[in-house]
Amino acid sequence: MSTVIGFDFGTKSIGVAVGQTITATASPLAAITAKEGIPDWQLIEKLFAEWQPEQLVVGLPLNMDGTEQPLTQKAKKFGNRLHGRFGLPVAFQDERLTSTSARESLFAEGGFRKLKKGAVDSQAALIIVEDFMNGYLPKSDNSL
């Protein structure tokens, strides 16, 4: 696996980020507008044509105690639709506190003007991709 595309699912905006497992780095991409959780599938198709992902990861919104919430099932449905449409493997990644971390990171970069909705969603997607890669990739042993 080398290219991973991650999604921070929302009913109005879906954050997107791309990660490279070879370098263990990720970058935010433009968020995709959604209508009641349904994205413009042609935009996602173009995104996949450009980046050629081998793995998809969808953030799984959970309550702080780990239980599911109403948005959890919608995110799972979105992931299942991605798999059905494009035939790519889809993993689900716990996304608790990713939006909070994304806001903190963006605010540190440029204050309130950086806190646009799409930017926060894609920064959250970046965190989802990084968390996925950190859990998936083998850890290196730097000891001698």
UniProtKB/Swiss-Prot annotation:
Record keywords: Cytoplasm, Hydrolase, Nuclease, Ribosome biogenesis
Keyword Nucleotidyltransferase (UniProt): no
SUPFAM superfamilies assigned to the protein according to its UniProt record, in alphabetical order: Ribonuclease H-like
GO biological process: rRNA 5'-end processing
EC number: 3.1.-.-
Compartments it resides in: Cytoplasm
GO molecular function: nuclease activity
Keyword Hydrolase among record annotations: yes
CDD domains: YqgF
Any one of the GO CC terms: cytosol
Family to which this protein belongs: Belongs to the YqgF nuclease family.
PANTHER family named in the record: POLYNUCLEOTIDYL TRANSFERASE, RIBONUCLEASE H-LIKE SUPERFAMILY PROTEIN
Known role: Could be a nuclease involved in processing of the 5'-end of pre-16S rRNA.
Name of the molecule in the record: Putative pre-16S rRNA nuclease
